Amino acid sequence: DLRALCPLTQMMGTSSYTTFANNYYTAASDAGGEAWRMVYWNQGMNLENMINQSEAAENWTLAGIGYAIKAYSWDFLTKVNGEAPMKQAFVPGLLSHEYDYQDAIYDQVRVWAKKAIECLEKEDKTNYGTRISQNDYIYGGDKAKWIKFAYAVIARNLASLTNKNDFKQKY
């Protein structure tokens, strides 16, 4: 996003650029917290509820889109922050969470992306009319594009692991 790109294109000699160059965030900003906010606050239980309600109603397009967004978001979060609370993230009333290791999150991201593809390849029980195409600002409800997106999430996820010693044995 622009918070990361602006220091690269303007004022290269300033101290804020030095902070960015050393730490990959703009000084005095919350750019590093944006991934947490996206996963836990902006999407959070809204995305969980959308997926659960869509699966219960057999509205596979919405469930697939939800899983694809969830996979992408968690992949991004673990790339930026490493370990994060995943399994206990949305347990009601829990005030302290155990962190999950990055490899567990990477594995779960692939599960969610594959689940997105599986859901998007199913026929919906409901005819949405134009509700999805008018409200999906990313791909306009185009299932084929969402499937490609989910495959891209898997590819990005595995690309992060290619230099691991055990990559060929595990994947």
Predicted regions and their residues:
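Structured, solvent-exposed acidic/aromatic patches
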Residues: 12-171
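Acidic, glycine-rich segments characteristic of secretory precursors and extracytoplasmic regions
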Residues: 1-11
